[in-house]
């Protein structure tokens, strides 16, 4: 469920399949809609570190900013909370695996994340 009690997915399989994650349901912890494409500032890049099926990348491919310990090395896989991107393709519409972070500091710093539309936000799921 999201912060307002709307069901996002009934289980992990549905979460990584036909889920209910949209800009209107992928709310902040305060129950507010997260800024996306067309909003200022765009904050739709969400830190996930996940492949589209929800599994981790192989250990030789860092997609978690050195297991969430570095702001200068590695990159993080990002999803789009509004399910929109610069292209009309599957990756751009993915909530959990759209593109890696990037930027002048390497992709993981507070300075890097806004360059592609992020703010260091993450999803929180519980059952």
Give short role names for the model-derived ranges.
Residues 1-127:
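Secreted/extracellular ectodomain signature
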């Amino acid at each position: 469920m999201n912060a307002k009690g709307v069901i996002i997915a009934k289980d992990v399989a549905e979460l990584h399949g036909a889920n209910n994650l949209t800009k209107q349901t992928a709310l902040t912890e305060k129950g507010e809609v997260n800024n996306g494409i067309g909003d200022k500032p765009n904050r739709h890049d969400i830190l996930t570190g996940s492949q589209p099926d929800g599994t981790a990348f192989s250990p030789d491919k860092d997609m978690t900013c050195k297991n969430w310990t570095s702001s200068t090395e590695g990159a993080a896989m990002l999803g789009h909370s509004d399910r929109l991107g610069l292209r009309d393709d599957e990756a751009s519409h993915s909530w959990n695996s759209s593109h890696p972070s990037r930027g002048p500091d390497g992709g993981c710093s507070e300075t890097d994340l806004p360059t592609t539309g992020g703010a260091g936000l993450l999803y929180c799921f519980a059952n």
